[in-house]
Amino acid sequence: MTDYDVIVIGGGHAGCEAASASARLGARTVLITHKMDTIGVMSCNPAIGGLGKGHLVREIDALDGLMGRVADAAGIQFRLLNRRKGPAVRGPRTQADRKLYREAMQREISGIENLSVIEGDAFDLLTEDGVVCGTAMKDGRIFRAAAVVLTTGTFLKGLIHIGQRKIPAGRVGEEPSLGLSGTLRRFGLQLGRLKTGTPARLDGRTIDWDRVGRQGPDENPVPFSFMTDAIINRQIDCGVTRTTDATHKIIADNIHQSAMYSGQIEGVGPRYCPSIEDKIVRFGERDGHQIFLEPEGLDDDTVYPNGISTSLPEDVQDAFIRTIPGLEQVKILQPGYAIEYDHVDPRELELSLGVRKMPGLFLAGQINGTTGYEEAGAQGLVAGLNAALRSIGRAPHFFSRTDSYIGVMIDDLTSRGITEPYRMFTSRAEYRLSLRADNADMRLTPAGITLGCVGDARRQRFEAWKHSYETGRTLLQSLSVTPSEGKRFGLKLNQDGQRRTAFDILSYPDQSIAALKPLWPELQTIPAGVVEALEIDAAYAVYMERQATDIAGVRRDENTSIPDDFDYEVLPGLSNELKQKLAQHKPRNLAQAMKVDGVTPAAISLILSWLRRQVRQAQRVGG
């Protein structure tokens, strides 16, 4: 029997971030995975980031997590999505070389102090007096710890479907995790089934690249990580093609052979990453669906056809793929498949990602009903931090939907639950003007420094950057001009006699620090590394001031906790229906109570009144 502070089960994106975060806080951590050489494997698409997802990667990085640095080390086609739109909704993304990503992640994991990696199959969880305290391995080994983090991905009772063929697996060639699913049911947790899918892998040497379009990388790649100075990998194009009427006919004629449409699959798939069968059934009026042909590596001929995930039989896959321009002679290296797996209802979780019914147990990733590497990594970081905090007797750290996309995601999951795999979008955040990808470090790194999860190198670099930023902002706010003075330098200002600072003027369309230098030569002293941040903050300053009151109100409601044992039955004036709904949902604070269907402002006032009464009674007893 071996003792640790924290045990992390699963070596995928959530598990790596959880183990790293726990170890960075100083907890003796062990990462248990089926195979060490699969740590960092990208099971589905070879890409990191995107709309909403890129924000999560930046936030992971701001807390000194791994994904951003690893993506920078492996990225082979960087693109900033929504570049023409406002900074709040821009999404950094890169295609990644699978081999480079895996190698970079394994290097990171192997270099972390306080972290051990063990191969094996965690079969059961150990408990004492209702508290999780370790894991039992299939081979008989026992590991004990103050906290356990489960990051099982699609391995929890995983089942692959290719046509009518079923293969128990967590992914191709790897056995599922069966014992832990039974353990969670034994604990009384509410489990469900979800489904995801992946397309066939193609031999790039058999693609007619002259018949497909091309999409290139950005000329100046923007890294994910604050710690990355430059992208060094060669950047490549990907191909672009479309399905045809012939493609659609083959799929429609064989839809009964799809595992998803034959009744073979119980689980619900991701709405925003539909299979090609779903696209044909739901959007049959379209004459074609776009496909991105994404090379899987700089020295790898494998191509990932993004947009045609499927669970049709192999012969049907071969037939419909060959109707796509450029793929007429293509060779399939691995068929596409759907995979079904167990997940836990995320409403079973605290905001710390700890399980309410089983203290000491934390869950992260697809086990919580999410989809995507980025969502998994962000949850892993939160679960790992809070598991480590528990192990050293510190209070958990909660992320707010007012300070991060991480907070938005966790609040959505724990308060609303899921009916399909959850994916992050910028539209999920009410305060997205504040929660931009470009300001993730300013928002979260100070909290990470306080927590102790940010290393010295990042802290020093961040503090130097912040000093430059604050010096530059002070300078911009100290320089001012009248409308008539500005007019002499070509500035179009309202002729109202009011002085405006350089910072104010930057909020005007088409203004920049460079354009203001003829008027104020001292602006040349502002370091290039903070110019864009200052320009964006100036552009959003008025809107941020308006949001500040709303954000303060939400934070106040989030900080008003509702005890787990709060008795809604004693509240006079609350309908029986609302009493039942609130007792079922068990909102953790007033902000979550407001989201319960049917809850009115009057009901919130009533709850708040009773909470205050309980506080006064407790104070009288204590006094």
UniProtKB/Swiss-Prot annotation:
Main location: cytoplasm
Biological process (GO), any one: tRNA wobble uridine modification
Record keyword RNA-binding present: no
Binding sites annotated in the UniProt record for FAD: 10-15
Gene Ontology CC, one term: cytosol
UniProt entry keywords in alphabetical sequence: Cytoplasm, FAD, Flavoprotein, NAD, tRNA processing
Subcellular location: Cytoplasm
Cofactor requirement: FAD
Domain of life (superkingdom): Bacteria
Quaternary context: Homodimer. Heterotetramer of two MnmE and two MnmG subunits.
Family per similarity comment: Belongs to the MnmG family.
Listed NCBIfam families: mnmG_gidA
Descriptive protein name: tRNA uridine 5-carboxymethylaminomethyl modification enzyme MnmG
Protein source organism: Rhizobium meliloti (strain 1021)
Gene (name only): mnmG
